[in-house]
């Protein structure tokens, strides 16, 4: 899975998705969609990756190949996003996280332990799942999450849903540069394709949930190791990124918190060569020995 040669963006997405098993679990009046990558025959430890707001499992397109085959990698489309239906309560983080935790248990078993990793809004979900399932979750890692420390500057995005063709693609590039990726050279066709697919399927209003205080409430309840990463150039955190890192370090002195140089908000995509080794290092600390 580590051989991402110069395929077309669609070929990369299709290849990685084809290597997963698709699951559906209950979510409100509908279903939650999951993908599981497993090359171990069910023996490797489980890590669940939670994407960001207005996202899908595709936010982890450069992370999944780095974790398989050492892990069983479980990625949902979070409730109200991607292919998943709306949750019973679309405003309460812990209610949504309960749906997520129940989905994990339905797929890998109620007695299976797992690590959770969340990007942006997914960090709130990861922290809440960790607080709700202290006997099941081995560690919580948050990447570029809001709700920690002082608010950053507001990021204004252009509307795209009414646009078509090249104008739509160009506007996605503008928005990716403003919000997600600091280095314009990293805004490639794959990033734009993922952004387009994700945004047109976004229904859950995640920013309010991320800023609700739920992530800090959950972090205060954690009984497991906490890790964190923020891009030095994370636009939603700007100019408060270092302050967020300092806030979390002060609140959780034993947490492993990293500031990623030259990196924007979507760190796992823009700086995969930096994020993936750090993430593997963090996960290794809680990897089961048998």
List PLM regions with ranges:
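Conserved HGGG/HGGXW glycine-rich cap/lid loop of the alpha/beta-hydrolase fold
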Residues: 35-83
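Gly/Ala-rich beta-loop-alpha elbow adjacent to hydrolase catalytic centers
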Residues: 118, 122, 126
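Alpha/beta-hydrolase fold catalytic core
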Residues: 1-47, 69-71, 108-109, 253-256, ...
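Active-site loop/oxyanion-hole signature of alpha/beta-hydrolase fold enzymes
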Residues: 61, 74-117, 277
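Catalytic histidine-centered segment of alpha/beta-hydrolase-like enzymes
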Residues: 263-272, 276
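Conserved loop-alpha-helix segment in the C-terminal half of the alpha/beta-hydrolase fold
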Residues: 230-263
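Conserved alpha/beta-hydrolase catalytic His-Asp/Glu region
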Residues: 151-152, 167-224
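Flexible "cap/lid" loop of the alpha/beta hydrolase fold
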Residues: 127-131, 138-168
